[in-house]
Amino acid sequence: MRRLPWLIPFFLVNISNGNNEFRIEFEYPNNEKSEKCFDSSKENDLLDLFYVSTNPLGPVVECRFLENSFILCEDPVPLYGPGQTGQQPANESFRNEGKCLKMGGYRAEDVEFTNVKCRVLPCIECHGPRTFTKSTPCIIYNGHYFLTTLLYSIFLGVVAVDRFCLGYSAMAVGKLMTLGGFGIWWIVDIFLLVLGVLGPADDSSWEPYY
C-alpha cells in the first residue's frame, strides 16, 4: 500500500521552563520526512517534565500504562546479594528500592514483588512523568535453560558439567574429583533438577521457551 507523505508526522519539540511543560506539536509536511523527538536517555535533567500533546488525531496514553516494549526498567536485585539469605527486615521499605528478600519461586504464588524504576524509551509519545516506579516480580534471567541443564546432568553429570553451568564451582570440583560422587551424586542431582530443588546459584530463574 502506497504511503502518503502527509500521513508522516513531523515532531517539533518545545521545552517551556516557565510552566514546566514539555510540549510536542505535530505538523504534516507534504514532501520530506523529518522527525525531532525527546531523547530521555540523554536529557536526564528533563526526565520528570510533563508534556501536553496537541495532536488532534489520537489520544495520549499515561506513561505508566505503557506496555513493557515501550519502557526500560531496572532489574530487581536480591537484598543480601546473589545466593545469600538473611533475617527478615523490620520494615518493607526495601521493596520501594527494587530489592527482593527472595528471588524467584517454584509456584506463581511464591514469587515476591518489588517496585523498580522505569523510564519511557526515546521518541515514545505518552502523557505524564516519563520516569516512574512499577511493581514487578522478583524474577531475573541469566541465560540458564532447564532442558539444557538437565541434559548436561544426565550425560555429563559424572564430570560435574551441570554444577559448573549452574555456578556451583566449589561443589562442582568435589563432584568432578569423585566422578559424580561415585555415581550417587550424579543420580541425586538429576532428581533434584526434576523436582525443582536445584536451580542456578545466582537466584535467577530458568529462561522461558517462547
Swiss-Prot record:
It comes from Caenorhabditis elegans. Residues 160-178 are cytoplasmic. The lineage of its organism: Eukaryota, Metazoa, Ecdysozoa, Nematoda, Chromadorea. Residues 19-138, 200-210 are extracellular. Residues 143-191 form the TM2 domain. Pfam families: TM2. This is TM2 domain-containing protein C02F5.13. Keywords: Glycoprotein, Membrane, Signal, Transmembrane, Transmembrane helix. Belongs to the TM2 family. It is a multi-pass membrane protein. Residues 1-18 form the signal peptide. Glycans are attached at residue 91. Its main location: membrane. InterPro entries: TM2 (IPR007829), TM2D1-3-like (IPR050932). The chain crosses the membrane at residues 139-159, 179-199. It is found in: Membrane. The keyword Transcription regulation does not apply. One of its GO terms (cellular component) is membrane.
